[in-house]
Every structure is written in C-alpha cells, then in structure tokens.
Amino acid sequence: MQKEISQAVIRRMPRYYRYLGELLDAGVERISSNELSVRMKVTASQIRQDLNNFGGFGQQGYGYNVQYLYEEIGKILGLDRQHNIIVVGAGHMGQALANYVKFEKRGFMITGLFDVNPALAGLSVRGIEIHMMDELPEFVKHQRVDIAVLTLPKEKAEQAAEQLVKLGIRAIWNFAHLDLELPDDVVVENVHLSDSLMQLSYNIVRRQDNE
C-alpha cells in the first residue's frame, strides 16, 4: 500500500516543479532547501519534510540537484506519461482551455470537445472538432480518456458528470459553479475561479482599511 500523502503537500508539488523549471532555464544546477524556502515562502524544514514523503532527493552539504529534482517531481506528478483529455462544455471557457497549448508540453493532450448546444456541432478549435454529448459514448469506446474537463453551466454539469462516470471516466477537472459529489473512486478537482478573486478582494479591502 502506498503512503498516504496530505493534500497540502500535493498542492505544493506543482509550485516546486514550476520554480525548478525556472531555475533550469536560468542555468542553476543546484539549490539548498534554505534558498528554495525564500522563493516558496515555506520553511526549509517544511520543504525537506515535503520531499522526504517521496524519498528525500537531497544530499547534506550539497542541497538538491535541480535537474534531478525537477525530473523526479515530474514523475511524482505523473508528467512522465500522456494524459488524454476531453473538454465537456465548448463555450468560451472550454475553448480557452482547448487553445492553451502549454497543457500539451506537460503531457495533457486534448483529444475531444463536447457540448449540448447544436449551434456548435461541427465547429473546431485548433483542429479538434466539437461533438454533441450524445456522441460521447461512442467516442469513449474508441479513445482512451483519462481526464474530463467540465465547463458546462451549473444546471447541466451534475448530469454530465454522472454520465462521464457511467462511461468509466475516473478523473474530472470541474469548472462548473458547484462542487461535484461523485463516487469515492472518482478523482475530482473543483475549481472556482471566483473564489480566488474574492480572496484578492478581501486582501485589497484589508490593505485599504489599514492605510
């Protein structure tokens, strides 16, 4: 049985990966946990604890080899393999995500777009045709789907999510304005963009009130 890793640790791993990539681009070959802590705004001890969950990777007196740590964290995050993605909801948000080419650099390949709006049928985004939802079962029969991105309106999202689960899809990146409640064997990441904006608003107001 694999060791259970806390979600707080997992949330920090992509940040480590991004920063290590920046260090590689800058030609940095090694870095200490103290130097990492300044950038990450967590303690050096926390960084060591986080990485020790997966084996450590550092050497006392040397620090971390940036290239090696970058590659190992990439493996931890599953970036050493391809993930096939479909986008369910081909409106503005869905099309924006389909147009984001950097996903492919991380191995996230958008292979299908689906919607419930007949006006979108047959259109394409970056060469990917938009299909209607009733075509989804046939698509899934012939194409491996690892992740579904859900960008439908709230009132249609739950039914679509249930359909995705019935078709055997076990990971959903949910941008609909509700938290999905799905079986335990389905991995769901609920993303509420307005939450981040409200946090920003809070910090603006607090700063203004303190001036």
PLM-predicted stretches and their roles:
Residues 104-126:
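NAD(P)-binding Rossmann-fold cofactor-contacting core
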Residues 93:
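Hydrophobic/small residue at the entry helix of a nucleotide-binding pocket
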Residues 30, 34, 39-82:
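HTH-adjacent hinge/linker in prokaryotic transcriptional regulators
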Residues 1-29:
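Extreme N-terminal segment that seeds HTH/winged-HTH DNA-binding domains in transcriptional regulators
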Residues 90:
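Glycine-rich Rossmann-fold phosphate-binding loop(s) that bind the pyrophosphate
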Residues 21-24, 126-211:
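Phosphate-bearing ligand-interacting subdomains
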